Amino acid sequence: MKPSVILYKALPDDLLQRLQEHFTVHQVANLSPQTVEQNAAIFAEAEGLLGSNENVDAALLEKMPKLRATSTISVGYDNFDVDALTARKILLMHTPTVLTETVADTLMALVLSTARRVVEVAERVKAGEWTASIGPDWYGTDVHHKTLGIVGMGRIGMALAQRAHFGFNMPILYNARRHHKEAEERFNARYCNLDTLLQESDFVCLILPLTDETHHLFGAEQFAKMKSSAIFINAGRGPVVDENALIAALQKGEIHAAGLDVFEQEPLSVDSPLLSMANVVAVPHIGSATHETRYGMAACAVDNLIDALQGKVEKNCVNPHVAD
């Protein structure tokens, strides 16, 4: 008999078929307590779990005594209780490499659109305000040769640095847990402490996962240290930033603009002050949202679950020691 798995995110037909070749697949709409209660027998027998954008916590795991592996269609896993999974010897798989280039493209798009005021001036054109040759009130700021500060020099940080260095001749500063020799050799990137990065960068790009240590890492103190002409970009996790402090910094002119793909609460409330600011580009967590990349992530997640339930955890496993 095939192992039973629960799928809580729709898959393309070919990937669903691949999953069904290996498992008995039960599809549910979400992982809410109501869904779990209504499908208690299925959850009790499931050995695998696959999907995204739902919390997997100790309470859910209590309902899934046979669970051996869970696979998320994402690189981030802050909605998983890793300690609870590990304590129960349940493998957690994710998709860290598939989306690197696409998210770096999104970051660069936010850099360009904020600096050149693309969204703002496009809306002005649509509103009929372009009635003569444009003047300084339509101008943006250059990107080329400006200093880019990257907070978090992982795969995505490296891909962003490549674009900025070779495409825009931008000097690169970075802050990370350790020196990154490849970044320094390939992009002439300079390691510095966070205060120095904030003080010297024209663009500050935040690419950090959400952990207890990074929660509200950026607050009023950090924004006050940035140049008043600086542009802040966040495409990591929303709660790494104190959003009220960001709003205040923008309102007071402590920073020039912001490009945001992530927020403390998602979806962003329609009455958020951020949405009334012309110098803010806010997009709905689209970092990896292309047809090609989202398919690749789903395919990777399917393969990850197949591997995990076959005892193969050489790659893409958050807690591989569970398999020892």
From Swiss-Prot:
InterPro entries: D-isomer_2-hydroxyacid_DH, D-isomer_2_OHA_DH_cat_dom, D-isomer_DH_CS, D-isomer_DH_NAD-bd, Glyo/OHPyrv_Rdtase_B, NAD(P)-bd_dom_sf. It holds the Pfam family 2-Hacid_dh_C. It catalyses: glycolate + NADP(+) = glyoxylate + NADPH + H(+); (R)-glycerate + NAD(+) = 3-hydroxypyruvate + NADH + H(+); (R)-glycerate + NADP(+) = 3-hydroxypyruvate + NADPH + H(+). The active site is at 237, 266, 285 (proton donor). It is an enzyme of class 1 (oxidoreductase). GO terms for molecular function: glyoxylate reductase (NADPH) activity; hydroxypyruvate reductase (NADH) activity; hydroxypyruvate reductase (NADPH) activity; NAD binding. Its EC number is 1.1.1.79, 1.1.1.81. Its main location: cytoplasm. One of its GO terms (cellular component) is cytosol. It is found in: Cytoplasm. PROSITE patterns: D_2_HYDROXYACID_DH_2, D_2_HYDROXYACID_DH_3. Keywords: Cytoplasm, NAD, NADP, Oxidoreductase. The keyword Metal-binding does not apply. Catalyzes the NADPH-dependent reduction of glyoxylate and hydroxypyruvate into glycolate and glycerate, respectively. HAMAP family: 2_Hacid_dh_C_GhrB. Homodimer. Belongs to the D-isomer specific 2-hydroxyacid dehydrogenase family. GhrB subfamily. This is Glyoxylate/hydroxypyruvate reductase B. The gene is ghrB.
